[in-house]
Amino acid sequence: MERHRARALGRDSKSSRRKGLQSAPPAGPYEPGEKRPKLHLNIRTLTDDMLDKFASIRIPGSKKERPPLPHLKTVSGISDSSSLSSETMENNPKALPESEVLKLFEKMMEDMNLNEDKKAPLREKDFGIKKEMVMQYINTASKTGSLRSSRQISPQEFLHELKMGYTDERLFTYLESLRVSLTSHPVSWVQSFGHEGLGLLLDILEKLINGQIQEKVVKKTQHKVIQCLRALMNTQYGLERIMSDKRSLSLLAKAMDPRQPAMMADVVKLLSAVCIVGEESILEEVLEALTSAGEERKIDRFFSIVEGLRHNSVNLQVACMQLINALVTSPDDLDFRLHLRNEFMRCGLKEILPNLKGIKNDGLDIQLKVFDEHKEEDLSEFFHRLEDIRAELDEASDVYSMLWDTVKETRAEGHFLSILQHLLLIRNDRFIREQYFKLIDECVSQIVLHRDGTDPDFTYRKRLDLDLSQFVDVCIDQAKLDEWEEKASEHCKKFEKECTDHQETQAQLQKREAKINELQAELQAFKSQFGALPPGTKIPLQPSVEGEAGPSALPPAPPALSGGVPPPPPPPPPPPPPLPGMPMPFGGPVPPPPPLGFLGGQSSIPLNLPFGLKPKKEFKPEISMRRLNWLKIGPNEMSENCFWIKVNENKYENRDLLCKLENTFCCQEKEKRNTNDFDEKKVIKKRMKELKFLDPKIAQNLSIFLSSFRVPYEKIRTMILEVDETQLSESMIQNLIKHLPDEEQLKSLSQFRSDYNSLCEPEQFAVVMSNVKRLRPRLSAILFKLQFEEQVNNIKPDIMAVSTACEEIKKSKGFSKLLELVLLMGNYMNAGSRNAQTFGFDLSSLCKLKDTKSADQKTTLLHFLVDVCEEKHADILHFVDDLAHLDKASRVSVEMLEKNVKQMGRQLQQLEKNLETFPPPEDLHDKFVIKMSSFVISANEQYEKLSTLLGSMTQLYQSIMGYYAVDMKKVSVEEFFNDLNNFRTSFMLALKENIKKREAAEKEKRARIAKERAEKERLERQQEKKRLLEMKTEGDETGVMDSLLEALQSGAAFRDRRKRTPKLKDIRQSLSPMSQRPVLKVCNHENQKMQLTEGSRPHHSINCNSTRTPVAKELNYNLDTHASTGRIKAVEKEACNAESNKKKEMELLGSVAKSESVPEVEALLARLRAL
């Protein structure tokens, strides 16, 4: 009781002193020319106690009065404050030491809530200016009486009362008084309390939450603790302290209770502010706190937030939507944002959204609009990412590598392996496999890409909704496709047969025309020698063999024929005689030893070049270039109809092309040639050891043969006699020819016919087969008959491929243009060398284009050529399609074709001779002569066609090789086609590599741009969060939470990822509290520009007599901390019309001070903040 009585007496004495202080007349403002009285301060007493007093200076009347705080202990420092103040007023402050002035100056700047950016220019000022500022600050504070009233309740007193552990109405009263103190006192007071007070507040909140007491006073107290935390977070210091304490976030998450809408609205707003200001780690801590609270209550972590949306309180609904937007828009990772949004949808947000959109509330409409816009932007970004994946990952190996990197060493690795293993079990049928994969693709797409934007919940019906209608339609279409493919295959075979018949007909026509020409030549020769026969003369017919040999015996015939009939080789042209002396002059002055030592040799070249050839242009590149090592073809190696006679490569000459060629294939860097020693591989022929066919060995081979067929010996003999192709196989005849004994052994074995039963099986078989006369020739003929059709079918396509390829090469315009372009580039690159001014080159040199590297070793001449064709000569690229049969022709050996056809002809001749000398059949089953005679007739017809086709093919490849001046003595047909096919393959590969290179460059460019954009967004996000914390134009550290909540309410706190990041001016206009007031919408727009311009200007000097308009300070709309509305509107009106001129600022300040009785300390604070 005594203790409470002492406290009551202390309160009475305090109240009496407070009344006495308030009754004293306030110091009025002085006129500009009037001398101010000196301050009487005791310099020695201005120690740390005085620094504490500066920390507690506040503006009277600008904050709400605090309710009386009961049961507080009296503090001895209270009685000392008045005496100390009176003592300091009596002394001269000018005698204050420099160190004390600097301490007071630092304490003054801290009490003014200046950050380090604002403190730095002030610290650089002259000591006299600092001292004058301190004196003015002390003088103003002492006159207003704030020094005498600032020590009424200290932070230590609040800490002491919080430690008492009250849980009744007294605690509620303490917390209400604490909330007002945290709101009204400066930052230094808040820092002094928050160092230990934050932990005490969290302890109280934890005790109230875990107490499970549903009394009304407990819930009111819990709400009051939340309000105290909000007041503490209204400063930058308090916000940083709470964000750094994990327990605070956990307790705030546990305090969310939809049954208390007012308290939950405050809690949700605080968490929203933390989310938009904090880094990714803070967001993770908030989510972790929500998860822990949900697990403790055994509910989903977002259940309380969604339940808050179901409440009838619109304020709570707006706050919950703010938190949802803060959580969903804060992460940088798209997948994480989609995951959080989908989780909210599953918790019931999807069903609530239509109801929320029906509520008419501006704040709620803003939050719903932010949610919808960010949802659409994320979905659009997600679809674009899928399109990029489809466009870039077109290789199955790249997709597999990405998937494997995603799942390896995770729990999903086993499932991924199981999926692959199941895919291997699909039936190995090309049609069925495709349908399986389509069905699997449909299932996977429905699982991972749900149409409504939410994760599919398969636990509801335990099944997957799969639309098989499209799959059935595909199966029907596939059946139709199979039918059409079968018909197309039949037509293709018919077309190939028609082409073959056409070529055969053409070949026969050419052969007969040649025969006609030959006969006409013989007739003309005969007439010229013997003259015309008289009419009616009969000439006896001679054998054809003698008639054919007649013309060759006539010496004069060839000269006579040269004028009438063109021979296969053209006659030597007249120009060749002077050509032996022309090889050196042909090159002009290019070779080191100039030919014949004359300067005018170049002008005489056109007179001696054959077939109207003109000398090639001599190029002189500005820098030395890499050489194209091609094989040069001279004019004397060309024929009149040669391709190189007609080329005109100058039409492709382009200065841009030549400059690009120079830059790419210059020789500024020495080319490092790696000399690789190629050792010739010695072909080691395996020498087959000669086998000695002894009787035991022959018997063993026959035993193996007979055991594999299991056919009676007599039946085998009958099959051979009858030439039964239905039962005789090629392998069977080959084995018989290989393993049968020779004729002498067969004859000797025939003597043991009487002892047949006593012989072993091989000998019995040999005895049976000894009765067949001329067994080996018979077997060889049967084998030839069995193989003939197959040989014809193998030879015909090869002849067709070579013939078609020759025609394609000659007809391809793209290939001709390509050769002209290569000739131009090669002559330019070889300028100044022995290969310069070339009329043509060997086609085998095309394969060497890929061996010519660029100066930077990053590309080749072939890739450069492909690039030029793609850019300017796209029609050249079609030559790849024009030479469709070149690949097959390159695999054909013309030499082997000719050998096979000749071998076939020899076998037919041998068969005809054997049939002529074959003995008459003695056995009724012997049908060899009959069947073989008919076979020989049909085979001869086939052979004649093959011979004709082969001759036509020979003429075609000889013509095409002569057309391109290819020396057939040095280059075979196989090499010619192989070189062209290798070049064609290399060209297609270079084309693909160029495309991949461009795609890789584009991909790298997109990745670089994306990385730069992400880095830019990260920096902008940091700046934005920094601006959210420093919302005031003058850097005030108070009102942080008010500004954040204002930004949340207006939607400006949620950054737009797809639009441009707003500038600092736009952000301040959108986040400033005065921009939300419609009454100031017009004037603030212009005033903000003025403030930013002034605020961004560096201050190199300070005028102590000038003041700045405290725009940001007076335009803070906090009803608990500001004066009357009329005065605020007056200050706002004056602020909107303020000028940057010093004179108008002074007039404005004077008018405000006179009309609204603004204390002088406010003008001083505004002046100091402006400095």
Curated annotation (Swiss-Prot):
Keywords: Coiled coil, Cytoplasm, Nucleus, Phosphoprotein, Repeat, Ubl conjugation. It comes from the Eukaryota. A motif (Nuclear localization signal) lies at residues 16-39. Residues 540-610 form the FH1 domain. The DAD domain regulates activation via by an autoinhibitory interaction with the GBD/FH3 domain. This autoinhibition is released upon competitive binding of an activated GTPase. The release of DAD allows the FH2 domain to then nucleate and elongate nonbranched actin filaments. GO terms for cellular component: actin filament bundle; cleavage furrow; cytoplasm; ESCRT I complex; filamentous actin; microtubule organizing center; nucleus; ribbon synapse. Residues 1-40, 60-95, 532-601 are annotated as: Disordered. It is found in: Cytoplasm; Nucleus. Pfam families: Drf_DAD, Drf_FH3, Drf_GBD, FH2. Belongs to the formin homology family. Diaphanous subfamily. The modification Phosphoserine is found at residues 56, 154, 604, 1072, 1157. One of its GO terms (biological process) is actin nucleation. The modification Phosphothreonine is found at residue 47. Residues 76-86 have a biased composition (Low complexity). Its main location: cytoplasm. Residues 553-596 have a biased composition (Pro residues). Residues 615-1013 form the FH2 domain. A motif (Nuclear export signal) lies at residues 1162-1171. SMART domains: Drf_FH3, Drf_GBD, FH2. This is Protein diaphanous homolog 3.
